[in-house]
Curated annotation (Swiss-Prot):
Protein name: Histone deacetylase complex subunit SAP30 homolog
Source species: Aedes aegypti (Yellowfever mosquito)
Gene Ontology biological-process entries: regulation of DNA-templated transcription
InterPro entries: His_deAcase_SAP30/SAP30L, SAP30_C_sf, SAP30_Sin3-bd, SAP30_zn-finger
Function: Required for the function of the class 1 Sin3-histone deacetylase complex (HDAC).
Gene3D superfamilies: 3.40.1800.30, 6.10.160.20
GO-annotated cellular components: histone deacetylase complex
Entries under PANTHER family matching the protein: HISTONE DEACETYLASE COMPLEX SUBUNIT SAP30L-RELATED (PTHR13286:SF6), SAP30 (PTHR13286)
The entry's keywords: DNA-binding, Metal-binding, Nucleus, Repressor, Transcription, Transcription regulation, Zinc, Zinc-finger
Annotated localization: Nucleus
Zn-finger segments (Atypical): 21-69
Record has Oxidoreductase as a keyword: no
């Protein structure tokens, strides 16, 4: 019920809770309960780019999606496109951990790009930027033994810059 533009709360409780997900999953209508996530143009673009077999049901009177599809879309956003082709090949990256650069802030990704002079096209979005940086990140050669030796030396000699900053700030107070 609506009183002079104010809600009594009754219609709010009948929102997505009694609605079914508005998506067609590979042509079949999803029967899960709709959550509070909506199928926006941005999400639709992600679904198209990642080639997920999801589309909105034109018969649905809302754009709310279930938690299952929300999670699936979010998961697809962070995965790299070429994962399937890498799984088919005989390459094994079992010893290399997968780093999810999408979790970093855009400014951090841009600083990395600027520092390593990684070239990208202008107007690139966060997902594309993190994917480009991930490709570059994997090409950086590292000498594990040398890095570990240096790390242990720095810890034992108390030469860590962060420790020095903490000590000077403690002495000043």
């Amino acid at each position: 019920m609506n009183n002079n533009g104010f809600s009594t709360g009754e219609e709010d409780s009948r929102g997505p809770a009694d609605q079914v997900c508005c998506l067609l999953d590979d042509g079949d209508r999803c029967r899960n309960q709709a959550g509070n996530a909506s199928y926006s143009k941005r999400i639709q673009k992600t679904v198209t780019q990642r080639r997920l077999k999801l589309s909105i049901d034109t018969a649905a009177r809302h754009i709310y999606i279930c938690d299952f599809h929300k999670g699936r879309i979010q998961c697809a956003r962070t995965k790299r496109r070429r994962r399937d082709s890498e799984d088919d090949s005989n390459e094994t990256d079992t010893d290399l951990p997968e780093v999810d650069l999408y979790q970093l802030q855009v400014n951090t990704l841009r600083r990395y790009k600027r520092f390593y002079k990684v070239s990208t096209r202008p107007g690139i979005n966060k997902a594309q930027l993190s994917e480009t940086i991930m490709k570059h990140f994997k090409t950086i050669p590292i000498k594990e033994k040398e890095i570990l030796t240096y790390f242990i030396y720095m810890v034992k000699s108390n030469s860590n810059k962060l420790d020095q900053k903490n000590n000077t700030s403690n002495e000043a107070t």
